[in-house]
Amino acid sequence: MQTMGGEHLLLSQLKGSFFLLLLAYFFRGRSPYYARCYRRLAVTPGAITIAIAIATDSIPALAKSKVLVSVCSHTDPCTASCNLIPFPRPFSNSLTRFLFCLGSARFCISFPCFGLSI
């Protein structure tokens, strides 16, 4: 099976998992809470969704087609309702907004944020 960009789905999933594991590594010394959250997400089906969005740059299409589902609810304590903050022009792309998504006073990945960040 291929993503919208023509890339094989398994390769996209691996990219997504790798990306999340990199985030976990980055946060490991700074915030064990976030590191644990990203590690958990890396081994869930949510990595596929992230990977497809990154690989194909089709976050708006995915959000509009309601393919995105909240993985946070399956990775407690990483649950959040998402409120986005404005970003300066160079940082206003969907991926940056996604990474800086705010939820209940904590930073957390919450897939409905994609729909709000566009």
UniProtKB/Swiss-Prot annotation:
Membrane topology value: Multi-pass membrane protein
Phenotypic effect of disruption: Increases frequency of mitochondrial genome loss.
Entry keyword set: Autophagy, Membrane, Mitochondrion, Transmembrane, Transmembrane helix
GO cellular component, one term: mitochondrion
Keyword Membrane listed: yes
GO biological process assignments: autophagy of mitochondrion; macroautophagy
Compartments where found: Mitochondrion membrane
Membrane spanning residue stretches: 7-27, 41-61, 98-118
Function field: Involved in selective mitochondria autophagy (mitophagy).
Protein name: Altered inheritance of mitochondria protein 26, mitochondrial
Organism in which the protein naturally occurs: Saccharomyces cerevisiae (strain ATCC 204508 / S288c)
